[in-house]
C-alpha cells in the first residue's frame, strides 16, 4: 500500500442488512475514529460484524439506503 494515500479509520456500529444481487455486500453504519460524532452508511464486501475497524480509502461517499 502506498504511504502517500490518506486513509480514514471507521468503526462498525451497526449492521443494517445484506444487499447486492446475491447478498454478497453488507450495508453498515460506521463511526469515524477521529470524529466520533460523524457517522455514515457504507457498503462492505466480505465478512463484517459490529465493532470491526474499517480502513476507508474514500470517506466522503455514502451508500444509498436499502429499501
Swiss-Prot record:
GO terms for cellular component: cytosol; cytosolic small ribosomal subunit. Pfam families: Ribosomal_S28e. One of its GO terms (molecular function) is structural constituent of ribosome. This is Small ribosomal subunit protein eS28A. N-terminally acetylated by acetyltransferase NatB. One of its GO terms (biological process) is maturation of SSU-rRNA. The keyword Ribosomal protein applies. Belongs to the eukaryotic ribosomal protein eS28 family. Coiled coil: none annotated. It comes from Saccharomyces cerevisiae (strain ATCC 204508 / S288c) (Baker's yeast). The modification N-acetylmethionine is found at residue 1. It is found in: Cytoplasm. Its main location: cytoplasm. Present with 94500 molecules/cell in log phase SD medium. Keywords: Acetylation, Cytoplasm, Ribonucleoprotein, Ribosomal protein. Component of the small ribosomal subunit (SSU). Mature yeast ribosomes consist of a small (40S) and a large (60S) subunit. The 40S small subunit contains 1 molecule of ribosomal RNA (18S rRNA) and 33 different proteins (encoded by 57 genes). The large 60S subunit contains 3 rRNA molecules (25S, 5.8S and 5S rRNA) and 46 different proteins (encoded by 81 genes). Component of the ribosome, a large ribonucleoprotein complex responsible for the synthesis of proteins in the cell. The small ribosomal subunit (SSU) binds messenger RNAs (mRNAs) and translates the encoded message by selecting cognate aminoacyl-transfer RNA (tRNA) molecules. The large subunit (LSU) contains the ribosomal catalytic site termed the peptidyl transferase center (PTC), which catalyzes the formation of peptide bonds, thereby polymerizing the amino acids delivered by tRNAs into a polypeptide chain.
Amino acid at each position: 500500500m502506498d504511504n502517500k494515500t490518506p486513509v480514514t479509520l471507521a468503526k462498525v456500529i451497526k449492521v443494517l442488512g445484506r444487499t447486492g444481487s446475491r447478498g454478497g455486500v453488507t450495508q453498515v453504519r460506521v463511526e469515524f475514529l477521529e470524529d466520533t460524532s460523524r457517522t455514515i452508511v457504507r457498503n462492505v464486501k466480505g465478512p463484517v460484524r459490529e465493532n470491526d475497524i474499517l480502513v476507508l480509502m474514500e470517506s466522503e461517499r455514502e451508500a444509498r439506503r436499502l429499501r
